């Protein structure tokens, strides 16, 4: 189970070092293969390959004749890349994906349970600001009984 957010720096080649606290669990869940893809909110998603496969299969079942479904397929499946971590636990983020997500030097790796989101520094700040604003009112369905 992946959780928590970490500010990380990409190296000069665009590689991201997976933090030690997540590395072993991610590599075990991934069977050595990770999938990076774009998300419609301009972040990237990082999945262990076995966790991505059923999601990909579900996406591919949608009709390509529906313009919205076709757009979702293009973003999620069309941008998907399989990557293998190097011996130092780094993964290469392709230039196209870095450009899509507007990455500069610092990115945020955000644990989302079964996978990670990877945000640009500006994108992560914006998401936190939007969340604070959205949560100042009524809670969304399913969160009414949540006790913190």
From Swiss-Prot:
GO terms for cellular component: cytoplasm; nucleoid. This is Transcriptional regulator MraZ. Keywords: Cytoplasm, DNA-binding, Repeat, Transcription, Transcription regulation. CDD domains: MraZ_C, MraZ_N. Forms oligomers. It is found in: Cytoplasm, Nucleoid. GO terms for molecular function: DNA-binding transcription factor activity; transcription cis-regulatory region binding. Residues 5-51, 80-123 form the SpoVT-AbrB domain. It comes from Dechloromonas aromatica (strain RCB). Belongs to the MraZ family. Pfam families: MraZ. One of its GO terms (biological process) is negative regulation of DNA-templated transcription initiation.
């Amino acid at each position: 189970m992946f959780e928590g957010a970490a500010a990380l720096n990409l190296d000069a080649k665009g590689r991201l070092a997976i933090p030690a606290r997540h590395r072993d669990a991610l590599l075990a869940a991934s069977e050595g293969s990770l999938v990076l893809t774009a998300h419609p909110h301009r972040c990237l998603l990082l999945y262990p390959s076995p966790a991505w496969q059923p999601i990909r299969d579900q996406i591919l079942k949608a009709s390509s004749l529906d313009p919205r479904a076709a757009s979702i397929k293009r973003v999620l499946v069309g941008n998907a890349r399989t990557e293998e971590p190097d011996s130092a636990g780094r993964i290469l983020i392709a230039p196209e994906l870095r450009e899509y997500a507007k990455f500069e030097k610092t990115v945020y790796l955000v644990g989302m349970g079964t996978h990670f989101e990877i945000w640009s520094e500006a994108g992560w700040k914006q998401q936190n600001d939007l969340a604070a604003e959205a949560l100042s009112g009524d809670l969304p369905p399913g969160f009414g009984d949540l006790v913190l």
